[in-house]
């Protein structure tokens, strides 16, 4: 397959520049006959989850296509679902560059992007143009300059604007790169947010005559007690699913490696075992009461199977996709 050669060339570039270059090419072909250049035939392996039918259990995690610019081209590669975003109500530039770093030996990435995106209105226009026939998730967050205590308003604004176009909505309260965001995972703040989100979901269901499930994305750095409290809150508020996990602040597996001391969230292979353990513990706590979407360090069929064995109904990839390319999609879907 050609990807090892493509990767070698892309890895000569700064990581964010490589991302921008790749998306520039994908934007050119998305929605055109040239999508055939990236199209892969993968077997149909339907999974029912959150009331939706996924063509196969493998999805693209949020963060790669923040603005929904390349939905069709990414869909042509064989993903059963694509999660775009994280998107915020207003455009924002994110954190200062450089803000994305490779840990090549560990096949990991550290990012402190900071929800850089062109805003929810722009994303909706891109979604309207797409023809992807898989499940489209839209991941939403709060603007950096919105005080945490008013953060729920940003989620509600995004929900209102995307509801008609989303297969499911992912609530990102676990990025380590927006100050204070992770505090929304705890106690009263979480209950307050989930109450508001559930009320808004009910209102929008009545308005649009369709039910769009809500999944909450959690961090891998939760203690046992915190994880139990989060699981309890999700069940009490009738949330439809949980995405486990986001990136980690833990650097124990990458000590001494180039870029290991960079601030931000670590993803890729170093996150693999940690996220799988969170899924296992979460699954025991939830006991089948809501489904888990497993993400974190999946870079092989074995890693995907481990997530499912731990309790995930669906899995997503991001860093593994960067390091292994489109062949990883076909490999996982075929053999999972």
Swiss-Prot record:
The keyword Membrane applies. It catalyses: (S)-dihydroorotate + a quinone = orotate + a quinol. Binds 1 FMN per subunit. Substrate binds at residues 66, 111-115, 172, 177, 246-247. It is found in: Cell membrane. FMN binds at residues 62-66, 86, 139, 172, 217, 245, 268, 297, 318-319. The active site is at residue 175. Its cofactor is FMN. Pathway: Pyrimidine metabolism; UMP biosynthesis via de novo pathway; orotate from (S)-dihydroorotate (quinone route): step 1/1. Keywords: Cell membrane, Flavoprotein, FMN, Membrane, Oxidoreductase, Pyrimidine biosynthesis. GO terms for molecular function: dihydroorotate dehydrogenase (quinone) activity; dihydroorotate dehydrogenase activity; FMN binding. InterPro entries: Aldolase_TIM, DHO_dehydrogenase, Dihydroorotate_DH_1_2, Dihydroorotate_DH_2, Dihydroorotate_DH_cat, Dihydroorotate_DH_CS. Its EC number is 1.3.5.2. Monomer. Catalyzes the conversion of dihydroorotate to orotate with quinone as electron acceptor. This is Dihydroorotate dehydrogenase (quinone). It comes from Escherichia coli (strain K12).
């Amino acid at each position: 397959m050609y990807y090892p050669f493509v990767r070698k060339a892309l890895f000569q570039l700064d990581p964010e520049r490589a991302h921008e270059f790749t998306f520039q090419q994908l934007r050119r072909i998305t929605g055109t006959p040239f999508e055939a250049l990236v199209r892969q035939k993968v077997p149909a392996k339907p999974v029912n989850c959150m009331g939706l039918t996924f063509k196969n259990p493998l999805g693209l995690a949020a963060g790669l296509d923040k603005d929904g610019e390349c939905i069709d081209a990414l869909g042509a590669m064989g993903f059963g679902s694509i999660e775009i975003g994280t998107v915020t109500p207003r455009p924002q530039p994110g954190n200062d560059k450089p803000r994305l770093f490779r840990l090549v030996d560990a096949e990991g990435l550290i990012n402190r992007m900071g929800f850089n995106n062109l805003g929810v209105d722009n994303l909706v226009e891109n979604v309207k143009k797409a023809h992807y026939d898989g499940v489209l998730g839209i991941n939403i967050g709060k603007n950096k300059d919105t005080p945490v205590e008013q953060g729920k308003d940003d989620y509600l604004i995004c929900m209102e604007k995307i509801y008609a176009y989303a297969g499911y909505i992912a609530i990102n309260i676990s990025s380590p790169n927006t100050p204070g965001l992770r505090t929304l995972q705890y106690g009263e703040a979480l209950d307050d947010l989930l109450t508001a989100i559930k009320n808004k979901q009910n209102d929008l269901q009545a308005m649009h005559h369709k039910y769009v499930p809500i999944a909450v994305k959690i961090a891998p750095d939760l203690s046992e007690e915190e994880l139990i409290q989060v699981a309890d809150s999700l069940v009490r508020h009738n949330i439809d699913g949980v995405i486990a996990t986001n990136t980690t602040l833990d650097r124990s597996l990458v000590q001494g490696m180039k870029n290991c001391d960079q601030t931000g969230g670590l993803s890729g292979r170093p996150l693999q075992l940690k996220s799988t353990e969170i899924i296992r513990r979460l699954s025991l706590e939830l006991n089948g009461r809501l489904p888990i979407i497993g993400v974190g360090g999946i870079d092989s069929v074995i890693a995907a199977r481990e997530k499912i064995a731990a309790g995930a109904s669906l899995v997503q990839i991001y860093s593994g996709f960067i390091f292994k390319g489109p062949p990883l999609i076909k490999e996982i879907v075929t053999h999972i």
